[in-house]
Amino acid sequence: MTRAKSGKISKNRHKKILKLAKGYRGRANSCFRVAIAKVEKALQYAYRDRRNRKRNFRGLWIQRINAAVRTHGLIYSQFMGTLKKAGIDIDRKVLAELAVNNSDGFASIVEKAKAHI
């Protein structure tokens, strides 16, 4: 029986890793040993930052809402508390979008919330 060296399998694996490492600096885009370490680390960063992105966007929405609410004489925490009392159930993403793109609609929401202070 002849010896099977799995040449095609390892070549395809190398090709896959080097394709993922395309655009990396130095030997990281051409040398398999270096590329596999860099690709593995890049995938770890990608996994971590998919979670961090959710935190970052929530913080951005809060900053935008806070800036818009302060022009109406409230602060963020008061505004969110009065929204809950008023029974207005709009999430932060939509509120931030309204604050940036539809200031009239946001102003009407703030006035409804102010009625429940």
From Swiss-Prot:
Keyword Plastid on entry: no
Origin: domain of life: Bacteria
GO CC terms in record: ribonucleoprotein complex; ribosome
GO terms assigned for molecular function: rRNA binding; structural constituent of ribosome
Alphabetized Gene3D superfamilies for the sequence: 6.10.160.10, Ribosomal protein L20 (1.10.1900.20)
A Pfam family this chain is assigned to: Ribosomal_L20
Stretch forming the signal peptide: none
Keywords linked to the UniProt accession: Ribonucleoprotein, Ribosomal protein, RNA-binding, rRNA-binding
GO biological process: ribosomal large subunit assembly; translation
Family as reported in the entry's similarity comment: Belongs to the bacterial ribosomal protein bL20 family.
Biological role stated in the UniProt entry: Binds directly to 23S ribosomal RNA and is necessary for the in vitro assembly process of the 50S ribosomal subunit. It is not involved in the protein synthesizing functions of that subunit.
HAMAP family: Ribosomal_bL20
Name of the molecule in the record: Large ribosomal subunit protein bL20
Native source species: Rickettsia canadensis (strain McKiel)
GN (gene name): rplT
